[in-house]
Design a protein with these regions (language model features):
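Short, solvent-exposed loop/hinge segments that bridge or flank secondary-structure elements
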Residues: 19-59, 94-97
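Low-complexity, intrinsically disordered Gly/Pro/Thr-rich segments
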Residues: 103-119
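Contiguous, well-ordered beta-strand patches that form the walls/edges
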Residues: 57-100
């Protein structure tokens, strides 16, 4: 009887009450790419990244002293999760005198069955390892 009540309660819950699926990604190397090629940073110059993305399109890519954050287009494609955000603001851009620091196009792709992904933001083009998670917990 309790199981039936629980099933009915879950069925009656609206889609808005279900938290979005979220992923947390971290890098083990730092790679930069431009039109003329790519290069990996030396281990002593490695900058760890903290990336959060959810299936409601929210994305945060943190590196250095701030984060590119905002809403991105989200798609599921054959076991891949893809986020694409245009001109996402950098959280410390107001402190910068660099006019290019205001925003960046951000792309994140995760192969959900493996937890392996790739992030591209402001010159960074870096492989990442990802796990499902809840932001702010763990």
């Amino acid at each position: 009887m309790i199981e039936m009540f629980a099933a009915l309660a879950l069925a009656a819950a609206s889609r808005d009450e279900v938290p979005p699926e979220a992923w947390n990604c971290r890098n083990q190397v730092e790679v930069w790419c431009a039109a003329d090629g790519c290069a990996a940073s030396r281990p002593e110059e490695f900058t760890p990244m903290d990336i959060w993305a959810s299936d409601d399109g929210e994305i945060s890519v943190c590196a250095y002293t701030g984060c590119w954050e905002g809403k991105a287009a989200f798609a599921r494609v054959n076991g891949r999760l893809v986020w694409a955000g245009d001109d996402l603001a950098f959280s410390t851009a107001q402190l910068s005198t660099d006019p290019g620091a205001a925003g960046a196009d951000v792309s994140l792709m995760i192969v959900s069955g493996e937890g392996v992904g790739f992030v591209r933001a402001a010159g960074l083009a870096t492989p990442v390892l990802c796990v499902r998670g809840v932001r702010g917990q763990g």
